[in-house]
């Protein structure tokens, strides 16, 4: 099963606004070459780094859960997964390192209910909590979270 990650309206606004601000900054610095190049380099680095983590879809295969990201996929074998269930990360959760809306939510977060996790999600209302046997946790999202959880749990029961 494969399901796309959709960005919430908040993420779309943050992404659009930040890109517009970067463009305005670059245009306004066109008379100062050193500032212009510094802002261009920072913009390229920010966007490239963000695209590396930006989640595009989630897929279950016979052997693993694949988190498709724009530039590189994250593969988690079912043998590493202990459980999958729905969750809603709190809006008051602490972002330790990552993005809180630009091209989705990605990075390390700490939530009072969930605990510390690495997030790859676009919409807080479509989240899945993936717990690994080693104690790590991932929060991912997709358009069909209930069906995705069912698919993951089916594969987990097959791999016991």
Question: Could you say what each language-model-derived stretch is?
Answer:
Residues 8, 61, 68, 79, ...:
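A structural detector for beta-sheet-dominated domains
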Residues 21-28, 41-45, 88-100:
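Charged, low-complexity, helix/coiled-coil-prone segments
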Residues 1-32, 132-137:
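N-terminal membrane-targeting/pre-transmembrane regions
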Residues 1-10, 74-93, 147-160:
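A signal for specific C-terminal beta-sheet/loop modules enriched in small/flexible residues
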Residues 3, 112-160:
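A membrane-cytosol interface segment of integral membrane proteins
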Residues 32-40:
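Short, aromatic-rich membrane-interface segments at the entry and exit
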Residues 68-134:
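Non-transmembrane, membrane-adjacent beta-strand/coil modules in membrane-associated proteins
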Residues 44-85:
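Conserved beta-hairpin
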């Amino acid at each position: 099963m494969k399901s796309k990650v959709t960005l919430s309206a908040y993420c779309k606004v943050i992404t659009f606004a930040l890109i517009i601000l970067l463009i305005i900054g670059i245009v306004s610095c066109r008379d100062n070459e050193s500032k212009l190049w510094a802002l261009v380099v920072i913009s390229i680095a920010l966007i490239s780094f963000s695209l590396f983590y930006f989640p595009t879809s989630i897929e279950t295969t016979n052997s693993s859960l694949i988190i498709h990201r724009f530039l590189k996929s994250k593969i988690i074998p079912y043998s590493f997964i202990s459980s999958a269930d729905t969750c809603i990360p709190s809006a008051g959760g602490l972002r330790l390192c990552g993005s809180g809306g630009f091209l989705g939510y990605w990075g390390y977060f700490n939530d009072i209910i969930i605990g510390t996790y690495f997030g790859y999600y676009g919409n807080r209302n479509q989240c899945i909590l993936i717990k690994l046997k080693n104690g790590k946790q991932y929060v991912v999202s997709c358009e069909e979270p209930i069906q995705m959880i069912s698919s993951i749990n089916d594969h987990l029961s097959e791999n016991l």
